[in-house]
Amino acid sequence: MSASLDLWNIPLRALNINVRKRLGLFLNPRNTVASDWMSVAENMGFSYLEIKNYEDCQDPTRKIYRTGKPLSRAQVGKLVSILDNVTRKDVVEDLRVLIEEDCKRYIERQNEPPVQVPEVDSCVPRTPERQGITLEDDPEGGIPELFDAFICYCQSDFDFVHEMIQQLEQTDHKLKLCVFDRDALPGSCVWTITSELIEKRCKRMVVVISDEYLDSDACDFQTKFALSLCPGARSKRLIPVKYKSMKKPFPSILRFLTVCDYPRPCTQSWFWVRLAKALSLP
């Protein structure tokens, strides 16, 4: 690692989804020669019974990363140290560039001047309201659950959302979608949770466009909030998906964005591949 980076002063939350996914690709497969996720779990202080219970998880590395209290409040340096201890320097070397980039971005964000002075900052509440808002969040405020994309949809289009889950999560794409009705816990302010998920937890947002979408206040808020985070679509953050033929005009605020047109026969065969690729970009 770069000598100019003090990894022991950079929290694990600085590492983005791509690094965490690659950790799983290296450590999830059971290996008789090299150490796998079980060795990492032992070094993190997990008991034998806990490790045995995680064996059935689809992504055990992600599971221990999220639930391991010794690691959840640790630094990037701690993770690198554990990988060294279990003789997985190959993982450290493969991820070195990505880890350094994430750490540098984190330091840059920390050094950026705030948009508002703290006395008038109304964007981030000083309460635990934004902690423990999804199914896999650490209730004690550890590493938050992160997603590849937030899905903006109205209730009448939920069948298409189910298909999206099947095509993008339950296939080789292995993307992680944030579906509000499935992933968000009840009991908190809808607007607070929604803004937190879109801005802090999800890399992108998929907007399911239909006539019913145009009548949804929730979809209107989510779309405008996401657009405000990426003026000019520089980060390709918002991806409109036209779900079915529309009688009403296409929303004007989205006309400057490239659309995934699901009902168009000539492109339907590669619809899911295009969408998955767009959501997989760094």
UniProtKB/Swiss-Prot annotation:
Keywords (A to Z) from UniProt: Cytoplasm, Immunity, Inflammatory response, Innate immunity
GO biological process annotation, one example: inflammatory response
PROSITE patterns the UniProt entry points to: DEATH_DOMAIN, TIR
Positions of region (Intermediate domain): 100-141
One GO cellular component term noted in the UniProt record for this chain: inclusion body
Domain (Death) ranges: 22-99
Domain of life per record: Eukaryota
Matching CDD domains: Death_MyD88
Pfam families in the record: Death, TIR_2
Alphabetized GO MF terms: TIR domain binding; Toll-like receptor binding
Localization of this protein: Cytoplasm
Region (Disordered) location: 117-138
SS bond list: none
SMART domains noted in UniProt: TIR
Role description: Adapter protein involved in the Toll-like receptor and IL-1 receptor signaling pathway in the innate immune response.
Annotated protein name in UniProt: Myeloid differentiation primary response protein MyD88
